[in-house]
């Protein structure tokens, strides 16, 4: 059965780096993989070396079209529909957490609804070191806005708390402490805890409650985006 992951998050959450990691892990398992960049503000893959790396791994990349040079002229390509009609093993969506990004995702609401039960994960990538996601109330407000504009229910949160090159194991632990509160208050579980191996090992050595932890190692250099 095709597995679809939608990664949504505000600027600085690290969602684009995670989308890349998930796609590369799927491809490494021999899965037919498609990565769809629906971030209409930060064109992470189209304008960076990341795009070339994706193609080298035989991952199909779909990015926004540029009608001309201005960012305001971005448009969604027809190829987005291939996520739903072609026979992929794994599809990863990288979606901006602002109103524009979430609304773009909402255009495909019925396509997501028509997916087989259990095949879709909608994951809010959270970095509590970013000002817009630093408290329970702010995260709750962000998630409500994402769900309203995308017309999809968030199925899980990803603790991706980091300070880029200044990250320590404390970032993941602080994210864990806050997101367990968010999970208890909202009913949205913590689906993944992500970071470099050294930080994950230190984090797990502190024996966090397994209910709020599922660890995933970054396979490429962590950058907040």
Regions found by a protein language model. Name each.
Residues 100-209:
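Conserved catalytic-core segment of NTP-binding enzymes
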Residues 15:
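Conserved lysine of the Walker
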Residues 11:
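The conserved Walker
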Residues 7:
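Hydrophobic anchor at the beta1->P-loop junction of P-loop NTPases
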Residues 217-224:
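Conserved small/polar residues in nucleotide/adenosyl-binding loops
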Residues 64-69, 89-105:
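Switch II (G3) loop of P-loop NTPases
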Residues 25-79:
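N-terminal phosphate/diphosphate-binding loop that engages ATP/GTP or pyrophosphate donors
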Residues 18, 22:
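Hydrophobic positions on the alpha1 helix immediately C-terminal to the Walker A/P-loop
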